[in-house]
Amino acid sequence: MTVAEAETYWTALAGLPRPTLKELFSDAGRLDRYAATLDLPGGPIRFDWSKTHLSAEVEAVFAALASAMDFEGRRAALIEGAKINNTEGRAAEHTAQRGIGNEASVEEAEALHARMRMLVDAIHAGALGEVRSLIHIGIGGSALGPALAIDALTRDGAKVAVHVVSNIDGCALEAAMKACDPATTMIAVASKTFTTTETMTNAASALEWLRENGVADPYGQVVALTAAPEKAVEWGVDETRVLPFSETVGGRYSLWSSIGFPVAMALGWEGFAAFLDGAAAIDRHFIDADLAGNVVVRAAFADLYYTQVRGCQTRAVFAYDERLALLPDYLQQLEMESNGKRVLADGSPLTRPSAPVTWGGVGTDAQHAVFQLLHQGTHLIPVDFLAVKTQGHDLDPAHHQILLSNCFAQGAALMAGKASDDGARAYPGDRPSATILCDDLNPATLGALIAFHEHRTFVSAVMLGINPFDQFGVELGKAIAKQIESGGGEGFDPSTEALLAAVGLAG
């Protein structure tokens, strides 16, 4: 379909009536239509999009656009392992890591998982000596996913204490090393290419730390997680400690591959397997459910409606559970690196807004920081609230009751608003929100939540006609940084040259 042909659907959406949320709720069946509970391996998850401006009329146009953009064909291509990452000539086979995909790719993933399990089980059994800590070194997709999963799922303890280090700032690695005993610490080096500057610099420093602290064979305590195993071996890692993953698994979609090694180390293999099972359950829902009952598709339709029709430039995500504190950061990369594009998949200009800015925080902290703008500011910002029915601590249940009360109150207040003769105390209301309520937070639940957002991001990309699986926008800055590091700090604009001179990096 051409850009001009797609534009007719966007024009139709823009021309539809815009009833308020209160008016939409005059339909007694609205809640049943826009809230759904999925029974998943980790327990039920409720997806409630009733407080958004989605309507039967809006969804009908989106369904027609989805058909015109060959959504079903693109979804099938994703699952079957077709080369849908056309700019790099690759498939995007993260679902195969969860057992959903073409037979050959699933078998390859299962073999790699079996290899990973053998190593994880051996370490936990003490076959490699005493291992109390793991410093996991990666960046971007090699770090954000493991950090989220470990922070969310090990608050009650872990089989091995995992410290995720991503920043090139030495303060990050130094803090991790201070918390570990070199004699009982393993180092995991996670890099798809095994050339990432930040990761390899941190890895070299970690090796030196082991060496300086009396470890006779530092490489004996290193595991490599990479799609370039030959480079890991060349760097010095024993071949038996290299856990490869397929080139067709993108970095920000790689948590399900050997990049999940630190998660398995922390949880044990059963926990990691449950994590995969939860994600696979969402895969099956995404594949099998029709558009009207597909919670993934509905979420993407809402995202697109607010960005493309209502002109919203951001969307906010607030986790009303401390264990999900890192989820907004994870979603920032997933959504903005995937869909923050300026061209269509065929290279022609994208004439509509691409991904909104994704941001957020943790409730109730965020209420005392940014909710003033959400309720009374001039920006319309759709909000996602995430909450967990079962508390994650042993303190007085009043803590959790207050937490959930605040979560649900915010959604109600955004919608209802409050009139006042004093403008400073008036709330306009009619501000959209969606709520995702998990019965419990466990490995399977978290896997389901992440897979839900992966597919949500993919649907938005299909509807816009863009490729969500490349990320060339990150390359220019890295190339310039390497130029500066090699002494080429000349030929820049006056501001950059002055900054380089101020820190002694001028050429």
From Swiss-Prot:
Q: Which UniProt keywords apply?
A: Cytoplasm, Gluconeogenesis, Glycolysis, Isomerase
Q: List the disulfide bonds.
A: none
Location(s) in or outside the cell = Cytoplasm
What reaction does this enzyme carry out catalytically? alpha-D-glucose 6-phosphate = beta-D-fructose 6-phosphate
Q: Which Gene3D superfamilies match?
A: 1.10.1390.10, Glucose-6-phosphate isomerase like protein, domain 1
Listed under GO cellular component are: cytosol
Give the principal location in a single coarse category. cytoplasm
EC numbers, comma separated: 5.3.1.9
The UniProt entry's GO biological process terms, in alphabetical order, are: gluconeogenesis; glucose 6-phosphate metabolic process; glycolytic process
Which Pfam families does the record associate with it?
PGI
Q: Which residues form the active site?
A: E337 (proton donor), H368, K478
Q: Please give the family membership noted in the entry.
A: Belongs to the GPI family.
Q: Which NCBIfam families match?
A: PRK00179.1 (NF001211)
Q: Which HAMAP family match?
A: G6P_isomerase (MF_00473)
Q: What does this protein do?
A: Catalyzes the reversible isomerization of glucose-6-phosphate to fructose-6-phosphate.
This protein's name: Glucose-6-phosphate isomerase
Q: Taxonomic lineage of this organism? A: Bacteria, Pseudomonadati, Pseudomonadota, Alphaproteobacteria, Sphingomonadales
